[in-house]
Amino acid sequence: MSRPIVAIPCCSKIIEGYTFDAVSRQYSAAVAHAAHCQPLLIPLDIALVDIGAVLDVAKGILFTGSPSNVDPKHYSAEEPVMPDKLDPARDAVTLPLIRTALERKIPMMAICRGYQELNVALGGTLHQEVHEQEGLHDHRERKELSLEERWGPRHPLKLKGRLREWIGQDEIMVNSLHGQGIKDLAPLLQPEAFAEDGLVEAVRGPDEHPFCLGVQWHPEWRVTENPVSMTLFRKFGAAAGADVS
């Protein structure tokens, strides 16, 4: 039996003046090895993307993390704090793709930037600099550490709702590599996990949606070695129609 297709919108990457559509391979590997689905990369030029056609063939969509941020013009009147870290081509594809996928009840999983896109697409807002907000911690990547330490477990999350039910734990440890975070939660989303400072780090879509999960951390990192990450990707794969037994 053919594996169900999971669409993965790319990021823009400029190399020697040429624009490339790129995705870190660990996302594609997680879709293939943990969710048991076939990853299919989606280019970012909106002129090349027929959202209806993508959703006609995709049984699920993974919205990945990225070095870039969602342009604040999509959720506030604020100027971007880091204008050099925007990816307008990605915004132009992912935000309408999320809204249409929700309407068509296509399973979605959203990670880091993708998690923030999910919130913005559905009417929520973001902190552009979490570490500058009173009472919130610094969740940014610690680049002075080794790669293994940077991507390893850093702080606990308190779980609730469906996420707690799936994982069977009240608390988990997660990595932390993000500068932005949810400020106002979109009305259609439900909070599922909280950091020690109260920041919402996981959300779920409406109950009637087959699978709509967003997480602020990076479960794709060494996914097959992490039982919690495997649970999330297997749930996603099963919702997309994969045989995850």
Task: Give the predicted meaning of each segment.
Residues L213-Q216:
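Active-site-proximal beta-strand elements of phosphoester/diester hydrolases
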Residues M1-M109, V120-H127, H131-W166, M173, ...:
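N-terminal beta1-alpha1 cap of cysteine-dependent amidohydrolase-like domains
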Residues H209-F211:
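A short, structured beta-strand/loop element
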